[in-house]
Design a protein with these regions (language model features):
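C-terminal interaction modules of eukaryotic adaptor/scaffold proteins
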Residues: 642-646, 656-659
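Transmembrane alpha-helix detector for multi-pass membrane proteins
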Residues: 515-545, 559-588, 595-624, 646, ...
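Acidic, Ser/Thr- and Pro/Gly-rich low-complexity regulatory segments
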Residues: 1-522, 526, 537-549, 579-592, ...
Length: 698
């Protein structure tokens, strides 16, 4: 502390601060009873009084005794006094776990004479324009919110919106307190249509929160998924939050408190915790809470969908079914032309900025994403639950078109939402969605060719990411009319032109990645082949000096050694061939659709198999040489475990790449199945049914 500076708190206040910090509320009370001035003066750096701090004790008796220690005039001032952000006593009480704390405040409010009363405590706002009710909903305190709502003197719906149009329902949804949001929506249905300062309704806000829904939640792994599906919420969830408390108005005590009989509301934390899985297993409890959030979010979405009619405003006037053919016949000329136009636009923009020009906006400009309806937003976010509920309740909503001529299929395709795409394919109106051309002249081909909304997928390498992009393009090509391939957008580019331009950087990175990977793996494969080739001539146990045959020729372990050595050699050489074929390929864009990723997956599969066989060969060699029959059995088990340890490490490090092998084999099986004539499959099926019929008849 420099000269001239003094501490802003006296010794008594600092003693009281230390008592509050250590949780010694008895000493805290004793100090304040000796000097009641501290009760209404600033107690900390946030401008809280000692009574504000006393709410942290969660002790209604302490709060009541401190308020009773004040004169009547000072008591009313203490109830209304705010801290540095104007949070009053009720604003701070919402953090308490017992509603008795708020009951104490409401009791003293009733005792204030009429001439001293001003605005009710529940209507006082802080610097953000939030009442205690608003703040309770914003922080997910459902129990306290319900209790305070019972003591509101005016219509509580007047307290649900801040001065900046931000509603209490928006705040609870943004905080992911969906049980609170459901209760609020059942209290005031008009909140569903309320728009915030950005023009967003609550359903639009929820449509931009994909991670709170099961369809877009992060992957949890096989074991956690199994626990997720096996965990039941029936006895806890299906009594909805608005039914979770039973309020008995006749059982209030002398303090004006209300007896809350808990039935099944999880938010309060009053239920028998021994019955909850989270009380016994933390891991299961975390999964259970996630499932609860998914179910609450889905239920909230259903309630909001019932009150959303934004899909009725649709723009079909500018529909252009005519195909615009390219002016320049050469693809390279079209790409050069668009690059030239971009450079011209960039130069003009720099000139305008240097002269302090401002861009002219018109009513026909493309709207911001906030003007998309919840249906289109949910489709772009991949939230299957919302899209399904909207289309199920309003079947005609699937034909909704935005101002920039986007429909639900366009949003799903350009955001690469496969679940939405597959869901729409089952709908009878799917063919009509396919032919839509946007205001910028873009077909579904153009949408999938652009990387404007591309999000990097969880794939092991750039080559597989490029393969996924090409697979999307192929998926769209199967459903779009063939003549759309020649259609040009407003820039005069076909979909193939856009695909090549937008994916040029990814194509370059994919070439470098797959080259380096193939070179590294081919080196490992050659080393494995060298080892197993040398092992074939280094016979364990040696040979018979009389006839040159191996000493252990009649042993089963020796036969096992021979087979695994040969298989390891063949597998390693096949993997070398696969990697060399990758290195000698031209690396064209469409080579990354099937050829190169398929070769890489097979190369990895054979390399891993050769490593396993090499370790098996080594195990057989050791067993033949040391003869573990004369030792304990546990030594053999320990040895075999040690042998496969490096194989397990290699598999764990490269596991994402081996997952691609599984996908490759599935697609290979699907391709082979498609190659079989349909008549043969139908004939086999009919023959099977006929045989089953005769057996049943006899």
């Amino acid at each position: 502390m420099t000269e001239g500076e003094v501490c802003m708190f006296d010794e008594t206040t600092m003693r009281c601060q230390r008592a509050a910090m250590s949780g010694n509320w008895r000493l805290f009370k004793k100090i304040l009873e000796e000097d009641t001035k501290c009760l209404v003066e600033p107690f900390d750096l946030f401008g809280n009084t000692a009574i504000h701090v006393a709410t942290r004790s969660n002790n209604p008796r302490l709060l009541r005794e401190l308020l009773e220690a004040l004169p009547e005039k000072d008591r009313w001032q203490a109830l209304r006094k705010g801290n540095c952000v104007n949070n009053t006593l009720l604003h701070e009480i919402i953090f308490c776990t017992t509603v008795e704390m708020a009951s104490v405040v409401f009791k003293f409010e009733k005792e204030v004479p009429e001439e001293h009363k001003g605005l009710p405590l529940l209507e006082l706002t802080n610097n953000s324009g939030e009442t205690p009710l608003f703040r309770a909903a914003k922080l997910g305190k459902l129990k306290m919110l319900k209790f305070m709502a019972q003591h509101a003197q005016a219509d509580i719906r007047t307290l649900f919106v801040r001065f900046d149009k931000y509603s209490i329902l928006h705040a609870s949804i943004l905080g992911q307190f969906f049980d609170v949001a459901i209760w609020l929506l059942n209290t005031d249905e008009k909140l569903a249509q309320h728009k915030d300062m950005n023009g967003m309704t609550c359903l639009q806000l929820l449509s931009n929160m994909p991670l709170v829904f099961r369809s877009q939640a992060p992957s949890m792994g096989t074991m956690k998924n199994l626990i997720y599906y096996c965990t039941s919420l029936s006895q806890y969830f299906f009594l909805l939050p608005e039914e979770g408390y039973e309020i008995d108005e006749d059982d209030g005590d002398e303090d004006g408190s209300v007896d809350f009989r808990q039935r099944s509301d999880l938010e309060s934390g009053q239920q028998d915790k021994a019955k909850l899985p989270s009380s016994e297993f933390n891991g299961i409890g975390h999964i259970w809470q996630r499932k609860k959030q998914h179910k609450l979010a889905e239920h909230l979405a259903g309630l909001l969908v019932q009150r959303d009619f934004s899909w009725q405003i649709s723009f079909h006037e500018n529909f252009q079914p005519l195909i615009v053919m390219p002016v320049l016949s050469s693809k390279s000329d079209r790409i050069k032309h668009i690059h030239h136009m971009k450079e011209m636009h960039k130069t003009n923009s720099e000139i305008f900025h240097s002269k302090s020009y401002r861009p002219i906006t018109t009513a026909t400009s493309i709207p911001h994403s906030k003007n998309y309806t919840p249906l289109l937003m949910a489709a772009g976010s991949g939230i299957v639950e919302i899209v399904e509920k909207i289309i199920e309740r309003y079947p005609e909503a699937i034909c909704h078109v935005s101002q920039d001529e986007h429909n639900v299929l366009h949003m799903a395709v350009k955001h690469r939402q496969l679940k939405i795409f597959n869901m729409l394919k089952k709908h009878s109106a799917f063919k009509s969605l396919v032919s839509r051309i946007t205001a910028e002249g873009r077909t579904l081909f153009h949408q999938i060719s652009r990387m404007e909304f591309y999000v990097e997928q969880h794939l092991p390498g750039v080559a597989f990411q490029l393969q996924d992009e090409l697979r999307w393009y192929e998926r769209v090509r199967k459903i779009v009319p063939p003549h759309y391939l020649m259609h040009c957008d407003k820039d005069g580019l076909t979909a193939e032109d856009v695909l090549e331009m937008e994916h040029r950087k990814m194509h370059k990175e994919a070439k470098g990645w797959i080259k380096e990977t193939a070179q590294s793996c081919s080196t490992v494969s050659v080393l494995v082949a060298t080892v197993v080739f040398a092992a074939a001539y280094t016979i364990p146990g040696g040979t018979n000096q009389n006839n040159g045959t191996p000493v252990f020729l009649g042993s089963r372990v020796f036969l096992f050694f021979t087979v695994t050595d040969v298989v390891a050699l063949v597998s390693s050489l096949v993997s070398v061939v696969m990697f060399l074929s990758i290195l000698t390929s031209p690396f064209e864009l469409w080579d990354f659709r099937r050829s190169l990723p398929g070769k890489l997956s097979l190369g990895f599969a054979f390399l891993f198999f050769s490593l396993v066989c090499t370790m098996l060969t080594f195990s057989a060699t050791v067993l033949l040489t040391i003869r573990f029959e004369n030792h304990r059995k546990w030594a053999s088990i320990l040895f075999c475990s040690a042998v496969f340890f490096p194989v397990a490490i290699f598999w764990r490090m490269q596991f994402p790449l081996y997952k691609m092998i599984q996908r490759f084999l599935k697609r290979l099986f699907k391709t082979l199945k498609q190659a079989i004539p349909t008549t043969f499959i139908n004939y086999s099926t009919k023959r099977t049914h006929r045989i089953n019929y005769h057996i049943h008849y006899h």
